[in-house]
Amino acid sequence: MTKDRLAALKAAQSEDEQDDDMHMETGNAQYMEEFFEQVEEIRGSVDIIANNVEEVKKKHSAILSNPVNDQKTKEELDELMAVIKRAANKVRGKLKLIENAIEHDENQQGAGNADLRIRKTQHSTLSRRFVEVMTDYNKTQTDYRERCKGRIQRQLDIAGKQVGDEDLEEMIESGNPGVFTQGIITDTQQAKQTLADIEARHNDIMKLESSIRELHDMFMDMAMLVESQGEMVDRIEYNVEHAKEFVDRAVADTKKAVQYQSKARRKKIIILIVVTVIIVILSLWLIQYIPGI
């Protein structure tokens, strides 16, 4: 009687443990599903930023190729830059939340958890992609600054004001567009148009520098994170690639084994049939030619 009760208690405990394991697996599966939904959302946001960066490049070219001040295109450019800034800050915030969650779970579970490794790899991949896009955006802005600076230099030359590169840089950094008009006679329409273009390019540079400063801290934070993760990601990618090669090789070997096994099985069947036929023939021969059988 006691043994029966003990067995029943063990069975009940085993069922409870199985239920707990099932609930834990279900919870983990749901968490990972939500995690991958978040990953796809972030990836989509980064792709949108990348597309907007390409649009910014087009606006830059349109502004510089237009001999007159194109206010509409500039407003569209300003809006694009504002959209990129908002989206970049959101992406950075979401990546930071994932990073904090990973660190918390790593302290609780250890680094050997399979789901945790998957999350770390996804986070690293997203971070690297984000930094690539923002690096391209930063380069786009600095290139545009240099092109605006070159445009100012050419317009000053046209106006008869010779300025060296260092002096021009100081004039730009002063933030005062009036420094460009000193010593220039503006009694013709052409001269006025030249100065208007210089002031417009100078304003563009001021906006660019403000935008670059606003994104600088975020950019450096993400760049440092990616650099620290680079070795880990490369190692994971190496292991994944070699694991894939191993699996491919194992699949090929398995196929060969199945083929060999199938051929061997066919040979056994053929041999068995041949032996059976021989036995039947011998039996018939014995019955026919040996009396008493």
Swiss-Prot record:
CDD domains registered for this protein in UniProt: SNARE_syntaxin1, SynN
SUPFAM superfamilies from the UniProt entry: t-snare proteins
Keywords: Cell membrane, Cell projection, Coiled coil, Cuticle, Developmental protein, Differentiation, Membrane, Neurogenesis, Neurotransmitter transport, Transmembrane, Transmembrane helix, Transport
Family matches, as PROSITE patterns: SYNTAXIN (PS00914), T_SNARE (PS50192)
Keyword Transmembrane: yes
GO-annotated molecular function: protein-folding chaperone binding; SNAP receptor activity; SNARE binding; structural constituent of cuticle
Family annotation (InterPro entries): SNARE (IPR010989), Syntaxin (IPR045242), Syntaxin/epimorphin_CS (IPR006012), Syntaxin_N (IPR006011), T_SNARE_dom (IPR000727)
Transmembrane parts of this sequence: 269-289
Biological process (GO), any one: ventral cord development
Compartments in which it is found: Cell membrane; Cell projection, Axon; Cell projection, Dendrite; Perikaryon
Membrane association type: Single-pass type IV membrane protein
A GO CC term assigned to this protein in UniProt: presynapse
Recorded coiled-coil stretches: 69-95
Extracellular side, ranges: 290-293
Keyword Metal-binding listed: no
Residue spans, topological domain Cytoplasmic: 1-268
Domain named t-SNARE coiled-coil homology: residues: 195-257
Family note: Belongs to the syntaxin family.
Assembly and binders: Interacts (via N-terminus, in open or in closed conformation) with unc-18; the interaction is direct. Interaction in open conformation with unc-18 promotes synaptic vesicle docking and tethering. Interaction via N-terminus with unc-18 mediates the secretion of the neurotransmitter acetylcholine from cholinergic motor neurons. Interaction with unc-18 is reduced in the presence of unc-13.
Functional summary from the UniProt entry: Plays a critical role in several secretory processes, including cuticle secretion and neurotransmitter release, and probably assists in neuronal membrane maturation or the final stages of neuronal differentiation. Plays a role in synaptic vesicle docking and tethering through its association with unc-18. Through binding to unc-18 mediates the release of the neurotransmitter acetylcholine from cholinergic motor neurons, and thereby promotes locomotory behaviors. Essential for embryonic viability and development. Has a role in dauer formation and adult life span. Required for locomotion.
Protein's recorded name: Syntaxin-1A
Organism: Caenorhabditis briggsae
Lineage: Eukaryota, Metazoa, Ecdysozoa, Nematoda, Chromadorea
